[in-house]
From Swiss-Prot:
Protein name (database record): Adenylosuccinate synthetase
Stated family: Belongs to the adenylosuccinate synthetase family.
PANTHER family for the chain: ADENYLOSUCCINATE SYNTHETASE
Entry GO CC: cytoplasm
EC code(s) of this entry: 6.3.4.4
Cofactor note: Binds 1 Mg(2+) ion per subunit.
Subcellular location per the Swiss-Prot or TrEMBL entry: Cytoplasm
Organism of this sequence: Thermoanaerobacter pseudethanolicus (strain ATCC 33223 / 39E)
GO biological process, one term: 'de novo' AMP biosynthetic process
Residues that coordinate or bind substrate: 298-304
NCBIfam families according to UniProt: PRK01117.1, PRK13783.1, purA
Amino acid sequence: MSTLVIVGTQWGDEGKGKITDYLAEKADVVVRYQGGNNAGHTVEKEGVQYKLHLIPSGILYSEKICIIGNGVVVDPASLIEEIENLQKQGISVDNLKISDRAHIVFPYHIKQDELEEISKGKNDLGTTKRGIGPCYMDKSERIGIRVCDLLKPKVFEEKLRRNVEKKNKLFKELYGAEGFDFEEMYQKYLEYAEKIKPFVTDTTVLLYDLIKSGKKVLFEGAQGTLLDLDLGTYPYVTASHPIAGGVTVGAGIGPTMIDEVMGVVKAYTTRVGKGPFPTELFDENGEFLREKGHEYGTTTGRARRCGWLDAVILKYSVRVSGITHFALTKLDTLTGLKKIKICTGYKFNGRIITDFPASLEDLAQCEPVYEEFDGWEEDIQGAKTFDDLPYNAQKYIRRIEELIGIKAAIISVGPERNQTIVLRDF
């Protein structure tokens, strides 16, 4: 590893947190490059669980530099709460760095998110209502407020006053809703500014210098390929770019500085919220995966929709992110199933297609074409090598490799760090 990007290959919730945590031990720097506190992951260390939303997983290692890049949108209240919770658990945050170019989430973003979802009725997108989308909207509209603005009281006052007036007018005229008090918000965010100020720096300079000096850098993505604003199942997507290409913009480095890309593949497929899901299961197998895999959102607590592994999706993810190898997670969840399936193509308009369609209307009409595999009953959570796995589990993994054209580098067989089979060193 010199620079390694970790991306989700499905609709998020692939287990990136555990893989990042595992690889972070060998990295010098861990960077978050997109999204906000709409994503979450749970990392275990020495039997203790840590729930993270904004701060990179590397924070659990005091010697690692952890960077929140310019592509992340930061809710200061959420960030400060996360910092304080880690400190209460005895975790140092001294090596946390926050980009001065990152955009700030405000209460009016959260309210706008909620009101827009309500106004869409049955056509709502199922957002986390954390204000992420509206914050990125303001960024695109060039009225966003950045961390560097927050640290200059007069500049911040001018920009916030303009935005509060604009948003209050929007809430009243479009939604018939109450607005916000400028002074109250201004004072509250000045308090936040003082608390985050020690962590703020130009992370583009810092990161460039770290890479040039030979440091090992791990880029930690949130969400997954199919939630990408351009390449995901639009409009049921997030407002940022959780693919490898998002790193260059969201962390402020050039594409030639990326050496490898690891795709995280859950051994089955899950999705939160609305939108087509070709391999979704509505039977006892779907319930089995949900309960055994504890498929409930870290951020929202929402039950995840569950289905069989979809190789069409995985091939698409490999292609658009240039993935070089993959980590397979939650293989142990499949233990106990008599039969396991992998979708190898879609039946659409009387023919078989193997490329992921752009149109959601087309995707909704796609019927999965499956290959069926025998399952296994053996407990695999103690497996230390590939050969320790049951033959049927090995066969399942090898078929995934054949279907998507890249090799597995890591296999996760349980939630603990030591329940990890490493096939390739980094």
